Amino acid sequence: MTTALRQRESANAWEQFCQWIASTENRLYVGWFGVIMIPTLLTATICFIIAFIAAPPVDIDGIREPVAGSLMYGNNIISGAVVPSSNAIGLHFYPIWEAASMDEWLYNGGPYQLVVFHFLIGIFCYMGREWELSYRLGMRPWICVAYSAPVAAATAVFLIYPLGQGSFSDGMPLGISGTFNFMLVFQAEHNILMHPFHMLGVAGVFGGSLFSAMHGSLVTSSLVRETSENESQNYGYKFGQEEETYNIVAAHGYFGRLIFQYASFNNSRALHFFLAAWPVVGIWFTSLGISTMAFNLNGFNFNQSVMDSQGRVISTWADILNRANLGFEVMHERNAHNFPLDLAAVKAPSIIG
């Protein structure tokens, strides 16, 4: 009898826990994805903060020349970073227990893998949690679809690119100047500025910013007057009110006359779908571009494409970009190799006659 009561009590406790996890009445929704998301993101955040402040230098190139990234080793907020794991580790999974000592783990950049893997699992689960909450509230699932764009971008630079290049040392450093260094080296090695998918991503991000500003300014300029000139116009809106707070007909008429009629949306639902879809699709394409360049399917090469009738090269923007790429190439990882492949493969100019 006692055993049966204890089983019923434990079952009730489990049911209560399940109900609490899945309850939409909590101040912050937890969800089953949240059960994984919360510890992984906390782990990534705590390890990142500690490593950013106090991690010792990391032998990123695997040539016994450690690179310092933490604040305690002379960096500031701009120059500091969690340095990627060593090229000597390559693509090996490198948890703490794989190293002979904590010093070795830190020297080889173990914290980078710990932060990145927990962070990726955390943001995957955050996306799943968005779907889960939408499902329980009876909403459509497009919020998590939109969030998949930055998730895809993070996955591309932290996971797909290192996998394609053969080492986590090629992943993006976790810092401001480290991010810029990653971008410059990526341009040097893959000519990303000449990749059409990157161009679509630029159009998505800049276009999304433009459309967001246009939409916000149009709505703000066509608000229905509910307040006096001495009050904030924000007091003219009450949360949950049924009537429109701005005149979409006036906004449509203004924009249609400013450009032309069919450049202006007359359907609020179609407009907001467009505002969401444009940057999301652009970032999807950029993520896909990085994922293809990870395997060295690089941007277009139009070097020395234009020549005069005598066969002399007429330099174009592509040639200027190529020279910049070579400059980036020779400046990064200076001691890891004597000559970059691009320069070593060039035939030496003749000095005879």
Curated annotation (Swiss-Prot):
BP GO annotations: photosynthetic electron transport in photosystem II; response to herbicide
Annotated gene: psbA1
Propeptide: 345-353
Swiss-Prot/TrEMBL site (Stabilizes free radical intermediate) positions: 190
Any GO CC annotation of this UniProt entry: photosystem II
Subunit structure: PSII is composed of 1 copy each of membrane proteins PsbA, PsbB, PsbC, PsbD, PsbE, PsbF, PsbH, PsbI, PsbJ, PsbK, PsbL, PsbM, PsbT, PsbX, PsbY, PsbZ, Psb30/Ycf12, peripheral proteins PsbO, CyanoQ (PsbQ), PsbU, PsbV and a large number of cofactors. It forms dimeric complexes.
Residues given in the record as chlorophyll a ChlzD1 binding sites: 118
GO molecular-function terms, A-Z: chlorophyll binding; electron transporter, transferring electrons within the cyclic electron transport pathway of photosynthesis activity; iron ion binding; oxidoreductase activity, acting on diphenols and related substances as donors, oxygen as acceptor; oxygen evolving activity
Organism name: Prochlorothrix hollandica
Class in the EC hierarchy, top level: oxidoreductase
Name recorded for this polypeptide: Photosystem II protein D1
Purpose of the protein: Photosystem II (PSII) is a light-driven water:plastoquinone oxidoreductase that uses light energy to abstract electrons from H(2)O, generating O(2) and a proton gradient subsequently used for ATP formation. It consists of a core antenna complex that captures photons, and an electron transfer chain that converts photonic excitation into a charge separation. The D1/D2 (PsbA/PsbD) reaction center heterodimer binds P680, the primary electron donor of PSII as well as several subsequent electron acceptors.
Family: Belongs to the reaction center PufL/M/PsbA/D family.
E.C. numbers: 1.10.3.9
